[in-house]
Structure formats: C-alpha cells, structure tokens
Swiss-Prot record:
Pfam families with a match to the protein in the record: Oxidored_q6
Keywords for this protein: 4Fe-4S, Cell inner membrane, Cell membrane, Iron, Iron-sulfur, Membrane, Metal-binding, NAD, Quinone, Translocase, Transport
Cofactor(s) recorded in Swiss-Prot or TrEMBL: [4Fe-4S] cluster
GO biological process entries: aerobic respiration; electron transport coupled proton transport
Record-given protein name: NADH-quinone oxidoreductase subunit B
Cofactor, how bound (note): Binds 1 [4Fe-4S] cluster.
Membrane topology reported for the UniProt record: Peripheral membrane protein
Enzyme type, top EC level: translocase
NCBIfam families tied to this protein: nuoB_fam, PRK06411.1
Amino acid sequence: MAGSSGTNGQGFFTTRVDTFLNWARSNSLMPMPMGLACCAIEMMGFAGPKYDSARFGSEAMRFSPRQADLMIVAGWCSYKMSHAIRRVWDQMGDPKWCIAMGACASTGGMHRCYGVVQGVDNFLPVDVYISGCPPRPESVLHALMDIQEKIRNEYSVVQDYEFGKARERAPIMPENTNRFPGQLEKPKTSTLTLEAPDADDAEEASTPEPVAA
C-alpha cells in the first residue's frame, strides 16, 4: 500500500478501497495447476519447501476451479485438451489471471504439428509468459511477482463492480471470432469426395454416340 496510503499521526492508515483489496488479493493468490507435460515437474518444484512460495501467499494449490484465481498452464496443449482447459477457465470466478509456463504453452515449442495448439493464448487470455524448456522454478516465482504487480497497479475492483470490466476479457482468437469461445479451428485436410452418378447420367454415358460414315 506504499504510495497510496499514509498515517495521519493517530495510529491508523488512510487508503483507498482499490488499494487495500488489491494488496490483499495479490498476496493470497490460489493457483490452479494445469500440468500437461514436463513443465509440470518444475511447477512441483516451485510449490515445494525449497522455494517457499508461501512467502507470496500462493503455497496452496487449488484443484477446483471454484476456489482458484490463477491458472498455470504448463506444457504443450493439444486441440482436444484445449476444450477441457477452456471449460475449467470458464468455471473460475472473476477476477482471474493466467500464466503460460514454458515454450510449448507460449508458442507451441518444438511441437509444430497439426494436433498441437501453437500457444494457449489462442483460447485463453494470458497475462504472463515464461520462456524456457522447461523453465526453472525461479522463473515461476518471477512470473508470480509479475502477476502481483499487475494486480496492484492495473486491476480496479471499483470498475469491475461498476462496469463489469472482468467479463470483457474475451479469449484471443483472431481467426475464429465467429465461433463459440474455446472452440478452435480444426486442422484443414485435403479430402476428395466421389459422388455416384445418377441413373440418367449413367445411361447417357453407356449409350455410344453415332459415328458419321
């Protein structure tokens, strides 16, 4: 609350509602671990006692979207799995934030093929990207601090309740704007469709044309 609060010499602080609530929310984040591949091992290390994520109030991993407000997507994501992740994201209450952990979650990484989504920002509004393959637990701590800074400086609980800004955060889907949120474009395949000819067409084709002498 530094910079926005101050003592008046009588033993109490004067501050704004936004500043106080954002300070409390930033120090009590409840991560939702979405471990999809090898980056999840490093996320387990981040949650262990060595790195002491309890200093930031985020030591309690929540495996229920109803109790979480921070999703950490760790690993590459297939098109089939993206629908399940989007449903879990929609079940999380506002306000909520998202971290794309690792190169695969951020850009698809080395899995540049038809079955892998090239970055989870195709169906989720990502707030912080973490590079690396896999990233170290220290990088996850740094991303968590970036989320805390974003909450303190950018989120406004007054605007959220008055104007509903949190619900305006639509998924980034530039090529699929006319689709239901979370529904991705299926890989395009070249198919050849053969249609059976009609009976009249078959009869005409079987009748030889007269040849002039």
